[in-house]
Regions:
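Hard-cation-handling environments
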Residues: 213-344, 349-352
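Core dinuclear metal-dependent hydrolase active-site scaffold
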Residues: 1-49, 120-180, 302-313, 325, ...
Length: 417
């Protein structure tokens, strides 16, 4: 239904029928960003009242943004996700709903419905649904709480007693700060897999801190401001973790109320961190709290920050520059030659971030892209992930990628058998 030929708006419908009874399962229900070529569907192909389960692979808006619409239209089934995604769900959707034109009363009603319908589940355990369908969640390593999903359907034939489908959701890169690496997938008949970076191999991630350090040293020498558009969920926390490691004497401002709220939740969910982050935290080196880090919560403080002189680092949303406080900062600083803008995440077609990277908008500030900060697996990582399946799937469907990415990854997967 969504993200078939683009990167945003993920939504998949699975229909199963046995003994005259049908089960409708939705996997993700996301919003579309920018000018992604795929026109978002205006109506769900089955009545939301008839959808039994909604699985959420993680809490990014391009995977959950239409959940309020689904409930508005009558959905009352179970929302299934990991425990960490459950904790992140309402803060992310509250922010999205606040910009949707809904009144406070409507938002409060929807939040209560979402909270009542959603359930957090453990990873690596098998749970049962209707009609003897089962599911198991695995760590996807994309952001905190992200998972890929194995759905197993009864299939009483001579060839097999079951049919297994995996939805990858968004797969993370290996060696991502804070997060454990993605799990290897089990055997399946059908694999529905993301392909965001199916045409690209990331630079060596071990060198990215040095790349960031070099750019920040330049800003320090130029006395300029470094603007980093960053997603509130995932990327901001990753940046704070590495800025703490770099330990430069430059003030760092997080100018995003949502990112600050999400960072507080990340801190409370330390049991889901990777080994390195846990060890640092146990030694008293909290990755999201260091000298020179400042939180900008109120709009008044945001307006004051617009007047700051460098050197300084400002992290603000939205990550694709489609809205949020980053727009005020860019308006203020794009035409100042000593300033820098660092993009550390995917920029969808038609977004301001993509247009800046491609040079469509003339600016005096320097534009940089650190693709090694992507929270998505690159081409080789995706291939290796598929190759780690004990037995190759009978079918692979690539989604969540632009045309070039899907075509190139298809070719590579065919070459690798």
């Amino acid at each position: 239904l969504g993200a078939k030929e683009c990167v945003t708006g993920s939504c998949h419908l699975v229909q199963y029928e046995a003994a005259g009874q049908s089960v409708n399962i939705l996997v993700d229900c996301g919003a579309v960003y920018g000018d992604d070529p795929e026109i978002p569907f205006t109506e769900f192909p089955v009545s939301p009242e008839e959808i039994d389960y909604l699985f959420l692979t993680h809490a990014h808006i391009d995977h959950i943004g239409r959940v309020p619409d689904l409930i508005d239209e009558g959905f009352s089934g179970e929302i299934i996700c990991s425990h960490a995604t459950k904790a992140l769900l309402l803060p992310m959707l509250h922010d999205a709903m606040s910009f949707s034109g809904r009144r406070d009363k409507e938002i409060h009603k929807l939040e209560k419905a979402i909270d009542d319908l959603s359930w957090g589940f453990e990873l690596h355990e098998t749970f049962s649904l209707k009609q003897d369908i089962t599911f198991k969640l695995f760590n996807a390593g994309h952001i905190l709480g992200s998972c890929f999903i194995l759905l197993t359907f009864p299939k009483k034939t001579e060839e097999s007693k079951e049919y297994r489908v995996i939805f990858s959701g968004d797969l993370g890169s290996t060696d991502t700060p804070i997060l454990p690496d993605p799990d290897s997938p089990p055997e399946c008949d059908l694999l529905v897999m993301e392909s965001t970076y199916g045409a690209r191999v990331h630079p060596d991630r071990s060198k990215r801190i040095e790349q960031l350090r070099e750019l920040l040293n330049k800003a320090l020498a130029d006395k300029g401001i470094v603007y980093i558009p960053a997603f509130a969920l995932g990327r901001t926390q990753e940046l704070l973790y590495e800025l703490d490691r770099i330990d430069l004497k430059i003030p760092v401002f997080v100018d995003s109320p949502l990112a600050l709220k999400i960072t507080e939740i990340y801190a409370k969910l330390s049991s889901f961190w990777d080994k390195e982050a846990k060890e640092l935290n146990s030694k008293g080196d909290h990755p999201f709290d260091f000298k020179g880090l400042y939180s900008v919560k109120s709009y008044r403080d945001h307006k004051k920050l617009l007047e700051i002189k460098g050197p300084a680092i400002i992290i603000a949303g939205s990550g694709m520059c489609t809205g949020g406080r980053i727009l005020d900062h860019l308006e203020q600083g794009l035409q100042v030659q000593r300033n820098d803008i660092i993009f550390v995440g995917y920029q969808a077609e038609g977004t301001l971030g993509r247009r800046l990277i491609e040079g469509e908008i003339p600016v005096r500030a320097a534009i940089h892209t650190l693709s090694s900060y992507s929270a998505h697996a690159d081409q080789q990582m995706l291939i290796d992930w598929v190759k780690s399946i004990p037995k190759p799937p009978k079918e692979i469907r690539l989604v969540h990628g632009e045309d070039l990415a899907r075509r190139e990854l298809t070719g590579k997967l065919n070459i690798n058998g």
